[in-house]
Amino acid sequence: MSAEQIESDLRAALARVIDPEIRRPITELDMVGDIAVTAGTASVDLRLTIVGCPAADTIERDVRAAVATVSGVTALELRVGVMSREQRDALTARLKGTRTSQFGPDSFTRIICVTSGKGGVGKSTLTANLAVALAARGLSVGLMDADVFGFSIPGLLGIPGSKPTRVGELILPPVAHGVKVISIGMFTEPGTAVSWRGPMLHRTIQQFLTDVFFGDLDVLLIDLPPGTGDVAISLGQLLPQAEVLVVTTPQAAAADVAERSALVARQTGQTVVGVVENMAGLVQPDGSILQLFGEGGGEAVAGRLGVPLLASVPLSVALREGGDSGMPVVLAAPEDPAARALEALAATLATRERGLAGRRLGLNVT
């Protein structure tokens, strides 16, 4: 086999190595420089995006594994460096170009805002588990923690100390359990509080939507703060095409307030797709169900809104333990009743078709 053929096979193998943060082939990202093969030894220049790249070990391991599959290569000389500023700027410009209006009207990403009327109904826990369950089904999933004052998503997914990676003007979100995650908690010091007025909240949400590079997503879940305040209004303005999932408990007080959050979403043009009832009873050892918070709240809200009750998630110790440990119950205890209910919800949302109504198809009619 000629050296030219081996080099061609080597480039093809490296094209299968995916940057774990950007989720693109490293060859497409211009992270592979010179390649040469001499007497069975392959020489490869690898350019990381930044100094101290958190994905460096993973990328280097995957490169070595890819090279090992190439026939005719018996050894590897891997030179690891860092992109120059010009190369990094070119990469940033290229990535920004591929994500123009990444969540605009023409986007095929399904956006689901998860809302509740009041706090303490388990909205964030359900959102985190739903994101992980969708990712486990093979979907590309992003999760934005829009609960700026009460952020909890990083802890629920086991990445409380993770920080995003910056490449130029772009922010690359950490990945947890196959989900790309961004939260204001990744930019604050432990033990500090966030106390901002409306304009600052709006700019934060806007920056999450424009400067965070999620790549090509099938689904973006947004964990809203409870209530009908500034963030909900901002997201209604920025993402009028988004769908809304309403979370409540069976209790009448929670159900009444949850309905109001759905009505505000509708006023901004968003579509309420369904209701999820959390804490819907505790399964006893004898199989009976103890209704600690009453019953019927979710069904009542769904009926008044004219949407389906998509799931009824029972009280579960495993669900709480999964949130405390950062290992969502859908992964830690998939046979738990709460996990099964959340998996069924993910299946319902994953198989729901997305229409093309209102989207430009880019066709030139002559």
Please provide the spans of the model-predicted regions.
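Walker A/P-loop phosphate-binding motif and the immediately C-terminal alpha-helix
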Residues: 110-147, 262, 275
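Conserved catalytic-core segment of NTP-binding enzymes
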Residues: 63, 203, 211-214, 218-325
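Short edge beta-strands and adjacent turn/loop segments
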Residues: 20-47, 313
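Phosphate-binding loop that captures ATP/GTP phosphates
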Residues: 134-196, 202-209, 299
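C-terminal boundary of histidine-terminating zinc-finger modules
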Residues: 325-336
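Flexible beta-alpha connector loops of hexameric P-loop NTPases
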Residues: 54, 187-200, 246-253
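N-proximal, solvent-exposed amphipathic alpha-helical segments enriched in charged/polar residues
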Residues: 1-33
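Extreme N-terminal, non-catalytic leader segments
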Residues: 28-31, 38, 49-52, 56-116, ...
